[in-house]
Amino acid sequence: MTRIILSILRQAAEPFTTRDIALLLLVERRLDRNDQRLLRLMTKRVGVALRGQREKGAVWSEHGPGQHMLWRLAHRKIV
């Protein structure tokens, strides 16, 4: 799942909410994106994966609209 999430963020032109990423993940995995229960579950799982990647320094988060977090890749300087 983390691989797909990072791939989604690599292709993003702007930061995405956790829910946006979960929706794109459902499409990538060819799952029913209209299933609200599945979307809520995947949003939680994506959030857990993103927090783990934030702790590793791979992604950054910032407060977005309402209680939503916006996520983007952390750009590392290669020396």
What function would you assign to each model-found segment?
Residues R10-R19, L24, E28-L31, W71-R76:
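Short capping segments at the starts of secondary-structure elements
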Residues R51-G64:
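A short, conserved structural fragment
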Residues M1-T17, R45, R51-R54:
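Positively charged, polyanion-binding regions of nucleic-acid-associated proteins
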